[in-house]
């Protein structure tokens, strides 16, 4: 570098050093404009995490408590063994939850995917209102949705039971599926679909061999989201369930009406584990 500078004329050397000085000043000024990490941000982050997840950890720990009271007396699996292995009502509620969650999620995924593909592929009147209307069931309070479904079932003379719970879960899951699949379709390349049509593929062939494979990650995430929402729903299920249609959240609610026990902690721990997995 020194040899190169030595061969330059004085005014060029001065210009070179001036340019380096300007670049350094500009770099320092740009560094000041960049967002800096606020002091204590790590502490705030971990405090928020602690606030959100500390109750869950306490619940998980006390589900293994040997005593019925809040005092820790030792580690034990007794509450899992006694209740899970010797309670047919619990297994029936668990079975109802799983059946309704997976079958309702399948139907909601099918209907929501078809709606998303239809709005993405075709133009029709009031198309712009479809996405707006899909947000309404999501922003309405669950108690409003539950009461409206209860009034509807009573109006059409449909007896409350497993069928009404299944219809309700399918209904409130469709908007979530529609939005997730629509977001995936918006990211896909429309020229691939046009190329398939130009090569002679029919509408059904294009749907099942091009569109569905491109949207498959969104469809899978929508299905899992629907299953999770269905498994944990209580409010809507409370309004539309009938005899023989008790789900796991309803079963837990019926137990805590007589006081919280480690059995409730154990059931809640199982639901948390199922949701996470």
Spans of model-derived segments:
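Transmembrane alpha-helical segments of polytopic membrane transport and secretion proteins
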Residues: 1-46, 277
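Membrane-interfacial helix termini and adjacent extracytoplasmic/periplasmic loops
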Residues: 23-33, 69-70, 77, 126-127, ...
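Transmembrane-helix boundary motif in ABC transporter permease subunits
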Residues: 29-34, 102-134, 151
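Interhelical loop and adjacent transmembrane-helix boundary motif
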Residues: 33-37, 80-89, 230-277
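Transmembrane alpha-helices
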Residues: 43, 50-56, 170, 178-181, ...
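A structural signal for multi-pass alpha-helical bundles of membrane permease subunits
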Residues: 53-68, 96, 146-157, 224-229, ...
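Short membrane-interfacial helix/loop motifs at transmembrane-helix boundaries
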Residues: 54-88, 238-243
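Loop-to-helix entry region at the N-terminal start of transmembrane alpha-helices
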Residues: 89-99, 154-174, 216-218, 223, ...
């Amino acid at each position: 570098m020194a040899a190169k500078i030595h061969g330059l004329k004085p005014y060029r050397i001065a210009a070179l050093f001036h340019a380096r000085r300007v670049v350094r000043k500009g770099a320092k000024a740009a560094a000041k404009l960049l967002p800096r990490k606020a002091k204590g941000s790590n502490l705030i982050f971990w405090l928020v995490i602690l606030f959100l997840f500390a109750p869950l950890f306490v619940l998980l720990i006390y589900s293994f408590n040997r005593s019925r009271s809040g005092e820790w007396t030792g580690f034990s699996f007794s509450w899992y063994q006694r209740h899970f292995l010797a309670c047919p009502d619990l297994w029936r509620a668990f079975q109802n939850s799983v059946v309704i969650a997976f079958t309702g999620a399948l139907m909601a995924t099918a209907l929501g995917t078809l709606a998303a593909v239809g709005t993405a592929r075709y133009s029709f009147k009031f198309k712009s209102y479809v996405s707006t209307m899909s947000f309404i069931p999501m922003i309405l309070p669950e108690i409003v949705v539950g009461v409206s479904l209860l009034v509807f079932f009573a109006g059409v003379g449909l007896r409350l039971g497993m069928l009404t719970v299944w219809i309700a879960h399918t209904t409130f899951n469709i908007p979530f599926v529609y939005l997730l699949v629509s977001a995936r379709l918006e990211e896909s390349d429309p020229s691939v679909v046009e190329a398939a049509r130009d090569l002679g593929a029919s509408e059904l062939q294009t749907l099942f061999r091009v569109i569905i494979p491109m949207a498959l990650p969104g469809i899978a995430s929508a299905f899992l989201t629907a299953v999770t929402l269905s498994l944990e729903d209580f409010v809507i299920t409370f309004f539309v369930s009938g005899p023989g249609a008790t789900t796991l959240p309803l079963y837990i609610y019926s137990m805590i009406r007589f006081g919280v026990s480690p059995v409730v902690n154990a059931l809640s721990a199982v639901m948390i584990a199922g949701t996470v997995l």
